[in-house]
A protein has these predicted regions:
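Surface-exposed loop/turn segments flanking beta-strands in extracellular/periplasmic regions
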Residues: 1-7, 54-64, 117-126, 182-197
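Gram-negative outer-membrane beta-barrel transporters
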Residues: 2-112
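Asparagine-centered polar/low-complexity signal
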Residues: 9-10, 146, 168-171
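Residues that define the transmembrane beta-barrel architecture of outer-membrane proteins
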Residues: 13-17, 76-82, 141-145, 158, ...
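Outer-membrane beta-barrel proteins
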Residues: 24-29, 84, 88-94, 149-155, ...
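Intrinsically disordered, low-complexity acidic Ser/Thr-rich regulatory segments
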Residues: 62-76, 129-138, 197-208
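C-terminal beta-barrel architecture of Gram-negative outer-membrane proteins
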Residues: 75-154, 178-179
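C-terminal beta-signal and adjacent terminal beta-strands/loops
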Residues: 102-120, 151-211
């Protein structure tokens, strides 16, 4: 579309199922271990329809176009997760918590507009180009380590707790938090014709080490 446009979608259906398990293990009088894991499948079950309007005058640019979303995964939702947490409760209100959290099998948020026939089929001049428009990118696995030191003070029936936390202990600055496909398309001139390619995926990075 050569103009700024808005989109309305209908008939979006997803299928979600999975399982999770947790365990709290007391290792010693002052130590315990928390474990958790989950596995699931979250995907689009049907192909929705999309109507695209020109922003300036509400002209319909594409009406009830099928968006080929079937079998795309729901974006930015980890389908595999794991967690382990150690807790130490020392004397006089001192304590330490250490946590490790992992998320895997994550995908970027797919674009409805990019998968319509007008975009993916008409502007893709080869099967390889069509694959560029419709392939859903998988995000890398994410691992974060957190540590917390705390001290509790007791006043009769009340308690005051002071905490010092370090998040993303490894200071991984390249860890991706989420991402989404751009609905926009690049037009590239080659010789006497044009080819079309999707714009790069937009990413949101996780915070570096924070206190």
């Amino acid at each position: 579309y050569a103009t700024y446009s808005d989109m309305a979608a209908a008939g979006i259906g997803t299928l979600r199922y999975g399982a999770e398990a947790t365990a709290l293990i007391r290792l010693a009088y002052r130590w315990n271990l928390t474990l958790a894991a989950s596995a699931g499948r979250y995907r689009y079950a049907v192909n929705p329809v999309v109507t695209v309007y020109a922003d300036a005058n509400n002209e319909v640019l594409d009406r009830n176009a099928t968006s080929y979303m079937g079998d795309c995964s729901v974006g930015n939702t980890p389908q595999l997760t794991g967690f382990a947490g150690f807790n130490y409760y020392g004397p006089k209100g001192w304590g330490v918590q250490a946590e490790a959290a992992w998320a895997g099998n994550r995908f970027v948020e797919p674009s409805l507009v990019r998968r319509t026939s007008r975009i993916a089929r008409q502007q893709a001049e080869s099967p390889e180009a069509f694959e560029l428009f419709t392939r859903q990118e998988r995000l890398g696995d994410a691992l974060t380590l957190n540590v917390t030191l705390f001290k509790s003070f007791y006043f009769n029936a009340s308690r005051l707790t002071l905490m010092l936390s370090v998040r993303n202990l490894l200071n991984d600055k390249d860890q991706l938090f989420s991402g989404y496909e751009s609905p926009r398309v690049r037009r590239i001139r080659t010789a006497d014709t044009y080819v079309y390619r999707p714009l790069d995926t937009r990413y949101l990075y996780a915070y570096p080490r924070t206190f």
